[in-house]
Amino acid sequence: MLDITYIRQNQDDVTAMLRNRLLESEIPRVAELLGLDRQRRELVQQADDMKALRNRVSRDIADMKKSGSGPADELIGKMKSVAENIAASDTSLKNLESAIEEILLTLPNRLHNSVPVGKSAEENVILKEQGGFDYPLDFPLKNHTELGKSLGILDFERGAKVGGAGFPVYTGKGARLERSLINFMLDTHTSGHGYTEIFPPFLVNRESLRGTGQWPKFADQVYTIEEDGLYAIPTAEVPVTNLHRGEMLDAADLPIAYAAYSACFRREAGSYGKDTRGFLRVHQFNKVEMVRFTRPEVSYEALEEIRQHAEAILLALKIPYRVLLLCSGDISANATKCYDIEVWSPAEDKYLEASSCSNFEDYQARRMNIRYRPDGKSRPEFVHTLNGSGLATSRLMVSLLEHNQTPEGKVIVPEVLRPYTGFDIIG
């Protein structure tokens, strides 16, 4: 959530940001917001004046009763009128603050000055392409769904029978390979990169979704358990970032770095017509998430570290990938800057997104009221929050299976995973 003071002082910048994000329809809401803000500040001043008057009248009544200087009926009547006006003012103020918050919750975040202006994914900037791995794929390739079926390690048909399309089943060595990927990534991030492991709830309340920015703007993408007021998490970012909601963090504890595995659930509303084969678009998938809480002045250094930690997984697995800096028209509403990491699918002949690494500055922390004191006596400030996929296994599995296939239709297990799988080949 943006600071109302920032919006008040930088209306032109906020308008330009909305235009660069292709959200021109939201621009009138800024003027509406500032109009409500003016009303709120005027009402606060009026309420303060009335409360000061009430205090003076109360003292006058007390003095008159103490001195016996005369009847206080007139002043008591005035006091009742002032009290009624204060109550009415408080009700109006509460309604104004609710209207202001409703708009603030839907406005997107600022954009970092390094984010390129663009209208679509075609204008994202390719920062890096990592290849150089020796894969002799000079034979007719099977895609991941064909490999999964022929090797008996993936069962999309039975998954669809149980939960519908987009709910895959891993079987036998496929299940072991998936679990090995998760454990390898968690071990790398905790033992190698210094993250503390978290195993979070997979169901959260609405306040948690609101805190990280999925609610209300992306409510249609979330699976809902209405009778219990709970929601299936779209990413571990939601429960893990909310661990410190409403807390004053100790500056000495910053930065805080968490790594968490979770299943992720997404309705993917509006995906009709897109390629939904196999793992290309699913409703449930597994992901290891990196989450950080930092001082504001070091958050962009932390973003680069998160990106490097995600890349380290791919380098260890010897998966070809590229890094994109997202443009203003493609970046998520909550992020100020975002890198996407895409893995190469040789059978599909295209890149697939496997990780997003984002800085949110104080956008989420303000929604969740997560603060710290730079030193013992200073005024509290909001922390900056960041996260990155480290990584999502579904798209990663596509690239891993397709790159490591043999002409005989077998799959060689990457060397770093063999201590986890207990086998070096599937098939």
UniProtKB/Swiss-Prot annotation:
Cellular compartments annotated: Cytoplasm
Sites where the protein binds ATP: 266-268, 282, 353-356
Pathway the protein contributes to: Aminoacyl-tRNA biosynthesis; selenocysteinyl-tRNA(Sec) biosynthesis; L-seryl-tRNA(Sec) from L-serine and tRNA(Sec): step 1/1
Keyword Cytoplasm (UniProt): yes
Pfam families named in the record: Seryl_tRNA_N (PF02403), tRNA-synt_2b (PF00587)
EC annotation from Swiss-Prot or TrEMBL: 6.1.1.11
UniProtKB keywords: Aminoacyl-tRNA synthetase, ATP-binding, Cytoplasm, Ligase, Nucleotide-binding, Protein biosynthesis
Domain of life: Bacteria
CDD domains hit by this protein: SerRS_core
One biological process term in Gene Ontology: seryl-tRNA aminoacylation
SUPFAM superfamilies, sorted: Class II aaRS and biotin synthetases, tRNA-binding arm
Keyword Calcium: no
Binding site for L-serine: 235-237, 289, 389
Catalytic reaction equation(s): tRNA(Ser) + L-serine + ATP = L-seryl-tRNA(Ser) + AMP + diphosphate + H(+); tRNA(Sec) + L-serine + ATP = L-seryl-tRNA(Sec) + AMP + diphosphate + H(+)
GO MF annotations in UniProt: ATP binding; serine-tRNA ligase activity
Gene Ontology cellular-component annotations: cytoplasm
Domains (record comment): Consists of two distinct domains, a catalytic core and a N-terminal extension that is involved in tRNA binding.
Role played: Catalyzes the attachment of serine to tRNA(Ser). Is also able to aminoacylate tRNA(Sec) with serine, to form the misacylated tRNA L-seryl-tRNA(Sec), which will be further converted into selenocysteinyl-tRNA(Sec).
PANTHER family (alphabetical): SERINE--TRNA LIGASE, SERYL-TRNA SYNTHETASE
Family, similarity comment: Belongs to the class-II aminoacyl-tRNA synthetase family. Type-1 seryl-tRNA synthetase subfamily.
Subunit structure, as described in the record: Homodimer. The tRNA molecule binds across the dimer.
Protein name as it appears in the record: Serine--tRNA ligase
Organism: Chlorobium limicola (strain DSM 245 / NBRC 103803 / 6330)
Gene: serS
